[in-house]
Amino acid sequence: MAPIAGKYVLESSENFDEFMKALGVGMMLRKLGQTSKPTVELIDNNGEWNLKTTTTLKTTELKFKLGQEVDESTFDGRDCKTVFTLEGDKLIQVQNATKGKSAKYTREFTDSQMIMLSECDGVVSKRIYKRQ
């Protein structure tokens, strides 16, 4: 099993604008999302996880335990009830929005990468991050 905890930098992105459109993200925020190169850091503190995403504009942090629902405010302003689960080398995040669209993120880990599939209303984006 590949390690999950670590720091990752965006290397490539496919269909991200279409995914953001499906979420209902406005044009200005989509433009910023397309040009940013986020760094994602996953830290495991004995089962208490911290997911930290850093861009030039904003840093967000989400603390969670696997299988337990947490409140999440997303980068695009949605409030969600979010649950993370682990299936082999995949960390799955399901956002159930209280208003707006819900989404699912599947992060698959290898020794050198994190491959993230983002899904909303049948639209899928693939982003590849390089492990630092």
Label every PLM stretch briefly.
Residues 1-132:
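Hydrophobic small-molecule pocket/channel-lining residues, especially in calycin-type beta-barrels
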